[in-house]
Amino acid sequence: RNNMKNNYPKLHNATWPGIVGKGPDSEPPISLDTLLDLTVNAEVDGVKFDGIDLGLFEPHFNIDESDDGIKRFAEKVSKLNLNVGSLVAPIWGGPAMGSKEDRAVFVDMVKRSCRFGQKLKEYGVRPSGIIRIDSASKPEAWSTDPVNNTKLIAATFREACDVAADFGEKLAAEGEICWGGMHSWTAMIETLESVDRPNIGFQADMAHTLLYLLGYNSPQDRILPENFDWNDQATLDAGLKKLTEALRPWTLDFHVAQNDGTVHGTGAHDKTGRHCQALDPNGKLDIAKHAGFWLRNEDGALTKAFKHICWDGCMFPNEVMTKQQTWNDILASMIKVRDQHGWYEAE
């Protein structure tokens, strides 16, 4: 192996943890500027974050920001030596299996997000990344008519894919137990297959996908045995191997995360995989090792399916999120992932 340090995948932080699960019945949101400062100031042995992934929602962003406004933001991140990667489309006002009007709202929000993303590309700060979606529908509602609801979600995603294709964008559905039609690994694959478009894929979050193993909202899709002992590494690895072999071919985007095997929701957010801090002693994942299950094929070869990876850690208390050390620890975990499963490209 050459002695050049791996410089891919690029290491990104996320803006949405400053908003998700925050609000009136929780803690106040953390400002975009604060998150940018914490990102830029994180450093481990001279290595820093390469970029940020954005949640395109208030109070951080106005999805209909003028070209000039987007340009100003592009100049700002550029001055901070950051790029932008993937964007979260604010689709929750339009459930993908809802009414005709709901579904039109969903597709329109994807369109607006694609336009925002295209402008960032045009202004030279977004070399890679996808538009992140989910079904914006609850598993309980989905389960009243699984076959037709999956068809409806797939039809909405298909329309959204065609709109995204006009902008040269790919859509990635983030598999979480709290989204109908995406609430289990088998439901997720069925939905993706039903969309039948080349620009649809999966966003794998290490915390959320761990709960797929437990069949949390779909007991029949459980992979790990009942009363599984978390000290049994071999069984955990075998479960993750099965899961990643099924979902890896669909994976277009990746969230490095830690999870303690439990679910969590604060504010207006439904219960979903609990994100843990990078060094949480209760974390069930060996972050660097288990990231490799997603970043390498069965034969051990790197997939190189995406040019950046992003940390996702939502619903931490503000006190934790405004400490610089939190982000240094996160960055250190991500550097380990890149050291073990990254590659070098001359730039």
How should these model regions be labeled?
Residues 1-127, 148, 158-159, 165, ...:
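N-terminal pre-domain/capping segments
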Residues 7-14, 50-54, 84-89, 129-133, ...:
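Hydrophobic faces of well-ordered beta-strands that scaffold small-molecule active sites
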Residues 14-18, 54-57, 89-92, 136-138, ...:
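Active-site beta-loop-alpha junctions enriched in small/polar residues
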Residues 37, 237-243, 281-304:
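A short, acidic, amphipathic alpha-helical segment used as a generic capping/interface helix at domain edges
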Residues 117-146, 167-178, 311:
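Active-site groove signature of glycoside hydrolases
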Residues 139-157, 163-164:
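Active-site cleft segment of glycoside hydrolase catalytic domains centered on the general acid/base Glu
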Residues 154-276:
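Acidic/histidine-rich catalytic cores of soluble enzymes
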Residues 270-271, 276-287, 310-347:
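Aromatic-rich peripheral "rim/lid" segments of glycoside hydrolase catalytic domains that contact
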